[in-house]
Amino acid sequence: MTFLELVRKRCSVRQYSDRTVEPEKMNYVLEAARLAPSAVNKQPWHMLLVESEEKRQLLQSCYNREWFKQAPLYLIVCGDHTESWKRADGKDHLDIDVAILTEHLCLAAAEQGLGTCWVCNFDAPRVKELFALPEHIEPIVLLPLGYPADESVFEGEKKRKTLTEIYAHH
C-alpha cells in the first residue's frame, strides 16, 4: 500500500465489531506513535490504553455517545505541559505534537485494518480526575480503536476541498 492509499483508507470509524484486537497489532500501532516527530524532539506525550470493562465505562462517562461505547479499546492521548517546547513568542507546541502522534496512531491502525476516530469534545477535567492524571498532564484526544463493524468503511470517497481551494504558489 502506498502512502496515498493509506491516507485515503484512514477514516473516522463510528461502528465497531466485537472482534479482539491482537496484541501484536496494538504494539505495531504504539510503535508507530513512539516514532512520531515532535518540536525539538521533546516527545511531550503520554498514552493510556483503556481495556478493562471498569475503566472503559469510566471513560465512556466522559463522552456519552452510543457509538463510542462500541469500541473494544481506547487510547487517552495526553500532553505533558512540562515537556512541551515553547516558541520565543510563547506559542506552546503541545497540541501540535500530540496531533502528530495521534495521526501516526490513526494511520498505523488503518494500515492494520483497525478503525479509529478522533474525539476531542469530551469532559477533560473528568478524565483527568477519573484516571488520576497529574496536574501537568492534559488529556487531549480520546481515540477509540477496534475493527470496524463494516470493513467497506475504508473504501468510501472522502469529502475534501480541491487542491486549488487550499493551495497557492507564489
Model-derived regions, located:
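C-terminal helix-cap and adjacent tail motif
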Residues: F3-V13, S17-T20, K25, V141-H170
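Glycine/small-residue-rich phosphate/adenosyl-binding loop
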Residues: K25, L30-E31, L35-L101
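Structural motif
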Residues: P72-I76, T116-C117, I140-V141
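Short secondary-structure boundary segments
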Residues: G79, N121-F122, Y147
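GST superfamily/GST-like fold recognition
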Residues: L114-R126
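Short, electropositive alpha-helical surface patch
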Residues: V127-I140
